Swiss-Prot record:
Belongs to the complex I 51 kDa subunit family. The keyword ATP-binding does not apply. Residues 433-462, 463-490 form the 4Fe-4S ferredoxin-type domain. Keywords: 4Fe-4S, Iron, Iron-sulfur, Metal-binding, NADP, Oxidoreductase, Repeat. GO terms for molecular function: 4 iron, 4 sulfur cluster binding; FMN binding; hydrogen dehydrogenase (NADP+) activity; metal ion binding; NADH dehydrogenase (ubiquinone) activity. PANTHER family: NADH-QUINONE OXIDOREDUCTASE SUBUNIT F. The keyword Iron-sulfur applies. This is NADP-reducing hydrogenase subunit HndC. Gene3D superfamilies: 3.10.20.600, 3.30.70.20, 6.10.250.1450, NADH-ubiquinone oxidoreductase 51kDa subunit (3.40.50.11540), NADH-ubiquinone oxidoreductase 51kDa subunit, iron-sulphur binding domain (1.20.1440.230). It is an enzyme of class 1 (oxidoreductase). Its EC number is 1.12.1.3. It holds the Pfam family NADH_4Fe-4S. Disruption phenotype: Disruption completely abolishes the NADP reductase activity.
Length: 490
């Protein structure tokens, strides 16, 4: 069967085995060259393994994009009686890239952690996973048990004298625990709060020992890189962003779900060729990349290459791979408020800019969406966002204002309409809506009068009705019920 356009645009490395093997069968994984990478690195020196990962150009897929090989090299160079390899499987935002890999190919992560352990001199690994992923936990536990039974974890792996084992620790899904120092504190039984760096975890992390924290997708790339070589991986992508990236397509788009594409592909190709564009003939308006802390990109950005530097230049981020598409019916002020509501709720509260600043930002946006905003509010919104971005302690706070700053930059006219005209161009903000009836279309059927909870619609049967706008609570029930499109929302 010929590949569809959607499939042709994709390249699966991190998700290469998902859907093709029984995730609970170690034999299925081994049949597709599983643990071959681990066997190969045990014939190399740790420095050679680190150098191979460096030359591949792999960057952390958890959001920051720090070169994985350099991070491993720092841990290798720090002498200690114990080192730790940690897998961050605690997806705190509403995306499921890590979950898909752990449920569909858990052995790729187990093997990669063992490879990483050998490379930095660690004998212990920990997967920090959110407790809300019961199937992923079940399959990961089985993968670890089976690997031990086959002699691929534990003592004297492949008769090489290398010892490495893995345990699980459970998180509660806090978004801030995606930050590596907060994650480590949580693993130690402390409150999940970030700490000032340096020292970096690769220097002093879990129990003050050198610790490498990589996310699931980063680890999933490692065995393929070891088997196929650094040149193979670095030949995919762009000059600064190598390999592929897994994205979760969501929102107003025909084809939702997970995709894996080469770095450097354009947003246009992802949204329209793979995603199929917006449904119901609606016009594309924006795409939020990078999850709740990302930025909104508009039509003018559709031909931007998806890599770390290009997205940053557009005031957005790669993040962990969220991609939410919005159409003509979405209000960008409400979108910014929606994402801020999430990050405000997820702040750990340790630093003042994030704890208090997020609340002040939300209050300003709330006033604007309720028709009470002023031009001074717009100035305050922008200046406070910039201050928080520069002064917050960790990445959560530093990227929190991204949705606000990007929408204010690209959709300034919408903010101005909310403030100056007290109108929501997308007809989303309830407080700024007005419902009226078009007498030319109204048949006087009475359906609207029966659903109005405050009885503010009046009229004679089979004659045009009217809405008392002074009593209307703008619930939209009449608009949804009318079969003749006679209710006007503006």
């Amino acid at each position: 069967m010929a590949a569809t356009t959607t499939e042709k645009k994709q390249l699966r490395i991190a998700t290469r085995n998902c859907g093709f093997i029984d995730p609970e069968s170690i034999d299925d994984y081994i049949a597709l060259r599983g643990y071959e990478g681990l066997a190969k690195v045990l014939t190399m020196t740790p420095a050679e393994v680190v150098d191979l990962v460096k030359r591949s150009g792999l960057r952390g897929r958890g959001g920051a994009g720090f070169p994985t090989g350099i991070k491993w090299g720092i841990a290798l160079g720090n002498k200690a009686d114990q080192k730790y390899m940690v897998c961050n499987a605690d997806e705190g935002d509403p995306e499921f890239m890590d979950r898909a890999v752990l449920e569909g190919d858990p052995h790729s992560v187990v093997e990669a952690m063992a490879i990483g352990g050998y490379a930095i001199g660690a004998t212990r690994g920990t997967v920090y996973i959110r407790a809300e992923y019961p199937l992923a936990i079940k399959r990961l536990k089985k993968a670890i048990d089976d690997a031990r039974e086959y002699g691929l974890l534990g003592e004297n792996i492949f008769g090489s004298g290398f010892d490495f084992d893995i345990e699980l620790k459970y998180g509660a899904g806090a978004f801030v625990c995606g930050e590596e120092t907060a994650l480590i504190r949580s693993m130690e039984g402390k409150r999940g709060e970030p700490v000032t760096k340096p020292p970096f975890p690769a220097q002093s992390g879990y129990w003050e020992k050198p610790t490498i924290v990589n996310n699931v997708e980063t680890f999933a790339n490692i065995p393929a890189i070891i088997i196929n070589g650094a040149d193979w991986f670095s030949g995919i992508g762009t000059a600064t962003s190598k390999g592929t990236k897994v994205f979760a397509l969501a929102g107003k788009i025909q084809n939702v779900g997970l995709i894996e594409v080469p770095m450097g592909i354009s947003l246009r190709e992802v949204i329209f060729d793979i995603g199929g564009g917006c449904p119901d003939g609606k016009a594309f308006k924006a795409v939020q990349t990078g999850g709740p802390s990302g930025g909104a990109l508009a039509n003018k950005d559709l031909d931007v290459a998806i890599d770390y530097e290009s997205l940053a230049a557009c005031k957005s981020i790669m993040g962990s791979g969220g991609m939410v598409v919005m159409d003509e019916d979405d209000c960008m002020v409400s979108v910014a408020k929606f994402f801020l509501d999430f990050t405000m709720d997820e702040t750990c509260g340790k630093c003042t800019p994030c704890r208090i600043g997020s609340k002040r930002l939300y209050e300003i946006l709330d006033r604007i969406t309720k028709g009470k905003g002023t031009r001074a509010d717009l100035d305050r919104l922008k200046s406070l966002s910039e201050i928080i971005k520069d002064t917050a302690l960790c990445g959560l706070g530093q990227t929190m204002p991204n949705p606000i700053l990007s929408t204010m930059d690209t959709f300034a006219n919408e903010y101005e309409a909310h403030v100056d005209d007290k109108k929501c161009p997308a007809h989303v903000c309830t407080a700024l809506l007005t419902y009226t009836i078009d007498p030319a279309k109204c048949t006087g059927c009475g359906l609207c009068t029966r659903v109005c909870p405050v009885e503010c619609i009046s009229g004679t049967k089979k004659q045009p009705h009217t809405i008392d706008t002074t009593r209307c609570i703008k619930c939209g029930a009449c608009y949804d019920k009318c079969k003749f499109d006679s209710i006007i929302k503006q």
